[in-house]
Amino acid sequence: MDTKVDNAGKCPVVHTHTAHGGRSNRDWWPNQLNLRILHQNSSLSNPLGTAFNYAEEFKKLDLEALKKDLFALMTDSQEWWPADFGHYGPLFIRMAWHSAGTYRTGDGRGGAGAGQQRFAPLNSWPDNVNLDKARRLLWPIKQKYGNQISWADLLVLTGNVALESMGFKTFGFAGGRADVWEPAEDVYWGSEDTWLGDKRYSGDRDLEKPLSAVQMGLIYVNPEGPNGNPDPLAAARDIRETFARMAMNDEETVALIAGGHTFGKTHGAGDAAHVGADPEAGDIEEQGFGWKSSYGTGKGGDTISSGLEVIWTTTPTKWSNNFFENLFGFEWELTKSPAGAHQWTPKNGAGAGIVPDAHDPSKRHAPSMLTTDLSLRFDPAYEKISRRFFENPDQFADAFARAWFKLTHRDMGPRVLYLGPEVPSEELIWQDPIPAVDHLLIDAKDIADLKEKILASGLPISQLVSTAWASAATFRGSDKRGGANGARIRLAPQKDWEVNQPTQLATVLATLEGIQKAFNDAQLSGKKVSLADLIVLAGSAAVEKAAKNAGHDIEVPFAPGRTDATQEQTDVESFAVLEPIADGFRNYQKGEYTISPEELLIDKAQLLTLTAPELTVLVGGLRVLNANTGQSQHGVFTKRPETLTNDFFVNLLDMGTAWKVSPDSKYVFEGRDRDTNEIKWTGTRIDLVFGSNSQLRALAEVYGQGDTQEKFVRDFVAAWTKVMNADRFDLA
């Protein structure tokens, strides 16, 4: 391309539609609701097209051949990025760990499930320095196997193969992680505007929810200790908090740290000032490589990544118990790496020469440890576990295998989504197991008869709708947890959540259980209806009745096949994180938070995988169905509740109503008649945002039009069915 420049002071492109752009709306109005998170990963950004089915493509994969190629790669050291100790295994373990380790239980976001390590910000986080090289080493293999293996699956599988190639027996591997093609905009990584900032803490080192890392740009903890303070006990507190937020208990935490640090080394050959820009900030000729170093050769023995220069074991490319042997076998003193980072070395020169150099066979070293490694010895609870693993290597190996599998598969959802020949047969409690269907399913006539019995039970439409919603709306598209399947709404902890109105819920469930028992007892063919199915069917029957009340005959799609989980299959502590702190669809908020109710609504909608139109029609419909928590009348803008009309939108958009903040609460508003000043309605910020936000108002206007009442009902039913079936992966 010729690039003749006549006037260097002028840009030859008209600044109307440029890739860089000028100030965005969010630059001008930083508090504007971000509805873009509801429309991520559309077909417009997917080069594979809407017909592509990754699960079907993965089934064609020759996994054995792929693993053979990965095994060969482990020791095929490249001059442009030489392998430490002649083996890429430790680098690939770090890559897989850091892909999966962003997962947090609070909202289920992060994790390895979509291959987000390829994109900003993760590809340029300080904790991911030089993992760009690991992914580039994999490119020839990804190129060879194409769409039969996603990047997301390949990153995790490569970590598994790395472990196996160094003599470790893994617990298993499941494929099924489909790639996305753009960075995730829905994940809140923190409010800091500098790398390694930690404004996320308040009070007595209280970490902001839902974050699970101690500083911006780290996967979990600072290996030097809190803010670089080399205190193993203080570090242990951080470790326990952050690993718990990644769904790990103390035993799993010790196993993961010790197991991961059995292999490889950290890199701090020189001053970090030698390291250049991260991949996103790099020059175009770097082609996505980052952190170019001017220290020596910038690679091999001159590599600078974390700034720490630590080799833990005498056999860094072989599984062993040597991490614990060294941890307990030496007394440790504080020292500094060549880059000036705090780390630990054996006292009095002990251990000198027992550890190999990563690149020079003529050099030997003493073992070394991170502050966070010493936490496993000096924290009393961690020490007890570490000592047991030290004395029982088989227990350590089993614990690490299981914890590694959990780390790399936690965000995949239920076992039905696991693909491939290496899926372990053992059912694990953290997978939220649900019994398989072991009976004949109800048919169309049964469904009609059950609907009739439900509607004749005396339960009001509002309670049937709110119960079905409460059961299904726990679903999170982030980690595919929650949902109506399993009927866990009848079990602890969900049955006792405030948002679910426990007293009312118990009444509804008792009535539905009576209908279920009568139906099942009457069957001679082994046919049954589960309570999970009946709860959803009851809500759908109520929606149909409400539509009929409005003059619309419509059938809500229903697919039986849900089963009922037991309390023994339900980890109460694990499910506690699914409790909504807010559910704008039910006009519920548990407390006062730093972010607004309307932002919490958008977040909830995104977790439910809803679009902005689906969000809008659901809120409008649920309000007129009187489904608010506690039957609050805020936002019930209708004189005919339990009738599926577009009254919410008609009355919200009525210019005869003026809104003012209630004297009783800054979150509640009074809608007064402009002429008489009489109160017509009350509403929350959730309700009023559909008239205030320009995008949501545009959608509300569609549903408030006189010619869209039938469309409103159809769209509500479609969105309702989507939520009811959100966890029905068997229907996909």
Swiss-Prot record:
Point out the cross-link Tryptophyl-tyrosyl-methioninium (Tyr-Met) (with W-97) in this chain.
Y220-M246
Annotated GO molecular function terms are: catalase activity; heme binding; metal ion binding
- Top class in the EC scheme: oxidoreductase
An example of a Gene Ontology cellular component annotation for this protein is: cytosol
Crosslink Tryptophyl-tyrosyl-methioninium (Trp-Tyr) (with M-246) sits at which residues?
A: W97-Y220
Establish whether keyword Heme is in the entry.
yes
The annotation note on the cofactor reads: Binds 1 heme b (iron(II)-protoporphyrin IX) group per dimer.
Catalytic site positions = H98
Which reaction does this enzyme catalyse, per its entry?
H2O2 + AH2 = A + 2 H2O; 2 H2O2 = O2 + 2 H2O
Output the GO biological process annotations, alphabetical, semicolon-separated. Answer: cellular response to hydrogen peroxide; hydrogen peroxide catabolic process
The job of this chain, per UniProt, is described as:
Bifunctional enzyme with both catalase and broad-spectrum peroxidase activity.
Similarity remark: Belongs to the peroxidase family. Peroxidase/catalase subfamily.
This chain's protein is named Catalase-peroxidase
Q: What is the lineage of its organism?
A: Bacteria, Pseudomonadati, Pseudomonadota, Alphaproteobacteria, Hyphomicrobiales
